[in-house]
Design a protein with these regions (language model features):
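Sec-dependent bacterial lipoprotein signal peptides
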Residues: 1-16
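Extracytoplasmic gating/loop element in the C-terminal half of outer-membrane beta-barrel translocons
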Residues: 412-418
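Bilobed periplasmic-binding protein-like "clamshell/Venus-flytrap" ligand-binding domains
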Residues: 58-59, 434-450
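Flexible, acidic glycine-rich loops studded with aromatic residues
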Residues: 362, 367-372, 378, 384-405, ...
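Structured, solvent-exposed acidic/aromatic patches
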Residues: 34-41, 75-399, 403, 418-425, ...
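Membrane-proximal, proline-rich intrinsically disordered regions
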Residues: 18-73, 120, 345-346, 452-513
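Short acidic (Asp/Glu) and glycine-rich catalytic loops that position anionic groups and cofactors
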Residues: 23-25, 405-411
Length: 513
């Protein structure tokens, strides 16, 4: 009898236990598992995509293109404000908040991947994955500090554990970048030697080709060594060594080619133009092209829509109209359709969809590496024509995606012989400026500031709004993101009223922070 008394109680206990287990299962978000159980190889895909889409070719690139006069800002909104150098846009903390947050989110992802590759981690011993993450981390930290100077780094990315991370000096961040790259080179060398393939097709850049990642690590190191020319007498020679190492290892560019052309997966620059119509050609670029009879002019200076194209032989021919930097009448137009656009940003004949929505994104191009070599060779008094031809040829191959080019790179460089003879460094920098007009404007912005720090000016910026009386309105750096300014007192104090962007260069380019 006692036995039967316990059976209902046991059944109730079992039901309660099952119900509790079931509720635990129901309350678990199986569609979004916690980050600690996700394999790092799956996370690297997002890190690659966001590095290209957000950090290398997002807000930083868009605004830098206007400051560099590679794009004319129109549309009577944000880009108009940037074109006219309005303080609220150029120095405002809201301007770069999205890309500031997006880059830190990418770095948090990469931090987790690197941790998973450590001893006892989910991806322990996977040197290929670790090396990839370290290269991408170096790139993201590099762009973030190049744009903003001193930033939260060593204490950042800790969530609620540390809500007020300190600002690290740019000097210390650069040391960290080089440490990341040295470790990446060692890890990728080991991965290559051992034939590791832990990432597979989750690697959207190279399909887990460790040799290509190793070459990319050297290319990234060459870029950041070049940035150090103002601060380190050995930086130029080291940049040349790393650039040559990248080429010798088979570097062919860090190029993101993932877009299907739909509205949900369109190349970032094309998506930006499609949503805003802010981007037109500039007379600054046009003049440089015309002065050199540059064969890229028909691609760089085009119509808003392919349907607007006219034959120059047509008696009613109207040439594309470029924006004049700082021209308020042009800047306040309701959209770029009243002006010209580079062909890669043009619309189809119907004028209702981008003509090239699948255009690739350069995280770091092959032409950039050859330009680094050409610049250092020119500065050393060596013959730079071979490297310069290779740099321009790499750019021509990219631009041919959008239109025909009537000359070969070697023929074009031959036509520049007198310019190269007169001032080889200047011509290299002009050619680099022109070659980076499509989606590499962040590095152009760095070049202009780097040369300025060295007492050089090879690109003549013509926007009269760069000065307001005796006060500069051309930004020597970009303002911090609003999330940092509003939530971190250290960032808020560094930001102040934002006007420091007009007077204080970042440390690598001669400033103090």
């Amino acid at each position: 009898m006692k036995l039967y008394k316990f059976i209902p109680a046991a059944a109730l206990l079992l039901m309660a236990s099952c119900s509790e287990d079931e509720m635990d299962r129901i309350n678990t978000d199986h569609g979004n598992p916690p980050i600690d159980v996700i394999n790092g190889r799956l996370m690297i895909t997002d890190a690659i995509t966001s590095t290209g889409f957000t950090t290398a070719s997002g807000g930083y690139s868009y605004y830098a293109s206007v400051y560099n006069e590679q794009i004319f800002g129109t549309g009577n909104n944000q880009f108009k404000n940037a074109e006219l150098r309005q303080i609220s846009e150029v120095a405002g903390s809201s301007t770069f908040n999205n890309v500031w947050n997006g880059t830190y989110a990418t770095l948090l992802n990469l931090k987790s991947i690197i941790a998973k590759c450590g001893e006892g981690g989910l991806n322990s011993g996977q040197k290929d994955l670790l090396g990839m993450a370290q290269v991408l981390a170096a790139l993201n930290w590099g762009i973030l500090t190049d744009m903003h100077g001193d930033i939260p780094c060593s204490e950042a990315l800790q969530g609620g554990a540390l809500k007020q991370p300190k600002l690290d000096t740019q000097e210390s961040i650069y040391k960290y970048i080089f440490a990341l790259l040295d470790d990446a080179i060692a890890n990728l060398t080991e991965a290559k030697t051992k034939g590791m393939s832990n990432v597979g097709d989750q690697d959207l850049l190279y399909g887990n080709d460790n040799s290509k990642w190793l070459a990319a690590a050297h290319a990234v190191k060459a870029r950041y060594k070049l940035h150090m020319m103002k601060r380190d007498a050995n930086a130029a020679a080291e940049a040349l060594t790393e650039a040559q190492a990248a080429i010798d290892a088979g570097f062919d560019g860090m190029v993101l080619d993932i877009y299907d052309g739909t509205e949900s997966l369109m190349s970032p620059w094309q998506a930006f133009q499609y949503s805003r119509d802010y981007c037109a050609c500039t007379t600054t670029v046009q003049s440089l092209l015309k002065d050199r009879q540059d064969p890229r002019e028909n691609v760089y200076i085009y119509y808003y829509s392919a349907g607007d194209e006219m034959d120059p032989a047509d008696p009613d021919y109207q040439a594309p109209v470029c924006g004049i930097p700082g021209d308020e009448t042009m800047a306040v137009l309701s959209g770029a359709w009243s002006l010209s656009a580079p062909k890669w940003l043009t619309y189809n004949a119907a004028g209702d969809y981008p003509l090239y929505p699948t255009a690739t994104t350069h995280i770091l191009s092959l032409s950039e590496v050859y330009f680094i070599m050409a610049e250092i060779q020119a500065r050393n008094g060596a013959d730079c024509t071979e490297s310069l031809s290779s740099a321009i040829n790499a750019n021509f191959n990219d631009i041919k995606t959008f239109g025909s080019i009537s000359q070969s790179a070697s023929e074009y460089v031959a036509s520049l012989s007198s310019r190269i003879s007169d001032n080889p460094v200047k011509e290299v920098m002009v050619q680099k400026y022109l070659s980076q007009c499509r989606d590499e404007q962040v590095e152009t912005y760095n070049d202009i500031r780097r040369c300025k720090a060295l007492g050089e000016e090879f690109i003549t910026l013509t926007n009269p709004k760069n000065m307001n009386g005796s006060s500069s309105r051309w930004p020597l750096r970009l303002p911090y993101g609003n999330s940092g300014v509003s939530s971190n007192t250290n960032v808020r104090e560094a930001y102040g009223d934002g006007l420091y962007v007009f007077s204080e260069p970042v440390w690598i380019f001669g400033g103090t922070r």
